[in-house]
Amino acid sequence: MASLKSIIRQGKQTRSDLKQLRNSGKVPAVVYGYGTKNTSVKVDEVEFIKVIREVGRNGVIDLGVGSKTIKVMVSDYQFDPLKNQITHIDFLAINMSEERTVEVQVQLVGEAVGAKEGGVVEQPLFNLEVTATPENIPETIEVDISELQVNDSLAVSDIKISGDFTIENNPEDSIVTVVPPTDEPSEEEVEAMEGESATEEPEVVGEDKEDDEEENKED
């Protein structure tokens, strides 16, 4: 479990104050949830990133708030891609004995046999809904695809659970499948198609109409 220090933000801050705060390398944040009142804090952005890399997106953090240490998870955060900067964080204070349902990333492991034969690995499901107490939430769920042939697939029910957690998704939901390769036309077929399109006479717009008008004049 990683630790992170925070500093309580006093009073109401203007947009200019928050901009100055972010420019100094700090991120405005709020702490709320189990056993605590809503508290506005700020944390060091670099230190926060280090902690998340250590514990993962759903990891538990010992957050120092004033004279207390609160066990929290990151409930939400906002990121500015233009400035490459985290702009706000929501820390949720948690009860370690209470189960929570969160999204956990699926990580494919190995290279499918079917992919080596030209098949294409498709992954329709990238995250799974997992219920567990905070310390039992996995960082990722690994799915071994090394034995998959072309037209093989794996569903949620095929996952071998190696921890104290429950997957909430429909057991029949497909996680990964190996589809047959798409047949691409050969060079000869491409040249033949191009030749056919070149020999087709373009339709002259209005030609039929002019012929009808000439026939009417003769009548």
Swiss-Prot record:
Chain intervals for the UniProt region annotation (Disordered): 176-219
Biased composition (Acidic residues): 184-219
Keyword RNA-binding on entry: yes
One MF annotation (Gene Ontology) recorded for this entry: structural constituent of ribosome
InterPro entries, alphabetized: Rbsml_bL25/Gln-tRNA_synth_N, Ribosomal_bL25/Gln-tRNA_synth, Ribosomal_bL25_b-dom, Ribosomal_bL25_C, Ribosomal_bL25_long, Ribosomal_L25_dom, Ribosomal_uL5_bac-type
The organism's place on the tree of life at top rank: Bacteria
Keywords: Ribonucleoprotein, Ribosomal protein, RNA-binding, rRNA-binding
Keyword RNA-binding attributed: yes
Biological process terms in GO annotation: translation
PANTHER family xrefs: RIBOSOMAL PROTEIN L25/GLN-TRNA SYNTHETASE, ANTI-CODON-BINDING DOMAIN-CONTAINING PROTEIN, RIBOSOMAL PROTEIN L25_GLN-TRNA SYNTHETASE, ANTI-CODON-BINDING DOMAIN-CONTAINING PROTEIN
Stated family: Belongs to the bacterial ribosomal protein bL25 family. CTC subfamily.
Oligomer status and interactors: Part of the 50S ribosomal subunit; part of the 5S rRNA/L5/L18/L25 subcomplex. Contacts the 5S rRNA. Binds to the 5S rRNA independently of L5 and L18.
Record function comment: This is one of the proteins that binds to the 5S RNA in the ribosome where it forms part of the central protuberance.
Protein name per UniProt: Large ribosomal subunit protein bL25
Name of the gene this protein is made from: rplY
